[in-house]
Curated annotation (Swiss-Prot):
Protein's name according to its UniProt entry: Pre-mRNA-splicing factor CWC2
Main location: nucleus
PANTHER family recorded: PRE-MRNA-SPLICING FACTOR CWC2, PRE-MRNA-SPLICING FACTOR RBM22
GO cellular component: post-mRNA release spliceosomal complex; Prp19 complex; U2-type catalytic step 1 spliceosome; U2-type catalytic step 2 spliceosome
RRM domain residues: 167-241
Keyword presence, Cell cycle: yes
Database matches in Pfam families: RRM_1 (PF00076), Torus (PF16131)
Record's keyword terms, sorted: Cell cycle, Metal-binding, mRNA processing, mRNA splicing, Nucleus, RNA-binding, Spliceosome, Zinc, Zinc-finger
Gene3D superfamilies linked to this entry: 3.30.70.330
GO biological process: mRNA cis splicing, via spliceosome; positive regulation of cell cycle; positive regulation of RNA splicing; spliceosomal snRNP assembly
GO MF entries: pre-mRNA binding; U6 snRNA binding; zinc ion binding
Cited function: Involved in the first step of pre-mRNA splicing. Required for cell growth and cell cycle control. Plays a role in the levels of the U1, U4, U5 and U6 snRNAs and the maintenance of the U4/U6 snRNA complex. May provide the link between the 'nineteen complex' NTC spliceosome protein complex and the spliceosome through the U6 snRNA. Associates predominantly with U6 snRNAs in assembled active spliceosomes. Binds directly to the internal stem-loop (ISL) domain of the U6 snRNA and to the pre-mRNA intron near the 5' splice site during the activation and catalytic phases of the spliceosome cycle.
Assigned protein family: Belongs to the RRM CWC2 family.
Length: 394
């Protein structure tokens, strides 16, 4: 007995390693997966703060206007030939990063960052990145927080108007080359997703349409007084409304798609699937409910959604309760028979499929209606009956 109990005691007191993790079989190498979270980098200053100086404009007139920061009363100059090139240009790949504005919801974008001359870097109180579809602002202001006006300027420059959603930028004074379309697409695709580009090769003019209006506002400020592949100075303005009927139809269709998307987000997913016909069970249920007891009949959408169990208005749901009781007959009938006037029950004439029920016909038959003709009233006689204005005797 002692010889057999000793091995069992040894097995019971044997040390067993404990581990909470998965057991790795022998001969296999345990791989440890390390997830590295890429941190956002801070925005860098685009220019040296020591170089920022507020110099007055050169004197070109006799009177200096402190409100417009311009001289007046001098010789008239060509506003296109007298333009100077921009002092800097934004490089999104290197200059973008987080700032103090990232901690505040609803912050605007930095105008000087778009122009490439912001000296603050990560200490800036505005955003240093490109606008996205999730950056939504009031129509009265642009993405930089500047107030917009009810109408455009005469030269289509400035902030723009809040009366129309303008996503198209006009670019003039482009150096004409054979690859002008490729050059324009390469430089302006940096500021956001481009929907359409139209280039007039012989005139050096281009129209760039962005998918987001905020990107168009950013591109207008970023490319003002810039140059492409040559030393030209671009003239960037807002584009006027396109008179092309196809463009107007395309814009109207885009507005309808935006409205449909907004309605789609506001409604429940199952309701949207039923309306769009993507739910097979909903299609079968719709076909049965909209037949109204008639084989092969399916009511149109306006009839189905106006009258039925799922009608929006309470009047349309009236009559589709589970059971109704007729006041005169005293027997239960289905809701659809009570609503559409099916065959009458009880002692009737036996007419089926009529417009009126048997109880209504019985009430009309029992009613006694007497029609009496009213006597014609005689014409009133008075002192002016025989009076004639043309008579000489009166």
């Amino acid at each position: 007995m002692s010889d057999t109990e000793q091995p069992q005691a040894a097995e019971g007191t044997e040390l067993v390693p404990t581990s909470n993790g998965p057991v790795v079989p022998e001969g296999q190498k345990k791989v440890k997966k390390i997830i590295r979270v890429k941190k956002k980098r801070p925005a860098r200053p685009q220019i040296d703060p020591a170089l920022v100086k507020s110099e007055p404009p050169p004197q070109t007139g006799t009177t200096f206007n402190i409100w417009y920061n311009k001289w007046s009363g001098g010789d008239r100059e060509d506003k296109y030939t007298s333009q100077t090139a921009a002092k800097g240009r934004c490089n999104v790949a290197k200059d973008s990063g987080y700032t103090k504005a990232d901690q505040t919801t609803g912050s605007y974008f930095c105008l000087f960052f778009a122009r490439g001359v912001c000296p603050k870097g990560q200490d800036c109180e505005y955003l240093h990145r490109l606008p996205t579809l999730h950056d939504l602002y009031s129509p009265n202001v642009d993405c930089f927080g500047r107030d917009r006006f009810s109408d455009y300027r005469d030269d289509m420059g400035g902030v723009g108007s809040f009366m129309r959603q303008n996503r198209t930028v006009y670019v003039g004074r482009i150096h004409v080359t054979d690859d002008i379309e490729e050059v324009v697409a390469r430089h302006f695709a940096e500021w956001g997703q481009v929907e359409r580009i139209r280039v007039l090769n012989q005139r050096g003019v281009a129209f760039i349409t962005y998918t987001n209006e905020a990107n168009a506002q950013f591109a207008k400020e970023a490319m003002a007084h810039q140059s492409l592949d040559h030393n030209e100075i671009l003239n960037v303005r807002w584009a006027t409304a396109d008179p092309n009927p196809m463009a107007q139809a395309r814009e109207a269709r885009r507005v309808e798609e935006q409205a449909a998307e907004a309605v789609r987000r506001a409604l429940p997913a199952e309701f949207v699937a039923e309306i769009e016909g993507r739910d097979p069970e909903a299609r079968k249920r719709r076909k049965m409910e909209s037949s109204y007891g008639l084989d092969g009949y399916e009511a149109p959408d306006e009839v189905h959604f106006a009258r039925g169990a799922q009608a929006v208005n309470p009047v349309g749901r009236r009559g589709f309760e589970d059971q109704l009781m007729l006041e005169g007959g005293g027997e239960e009938v289905s809701a659809r028979e009570a609503l559409f006037g099916a065959e009458g029950s009880g002692s009737g004439d036996g007419d089926a499929g009529g417009i009126f029920s048997s109880s209504t016909l019985a009430a009309l038959n029992s009613a006694q209606v007497k029609v009496s003709a009213q006597p014609k009233q005689a014409a009133a006689t008075g002192p002016l009956v025989a009076y004639g204005s043309d008579s000489e005797d009166d």
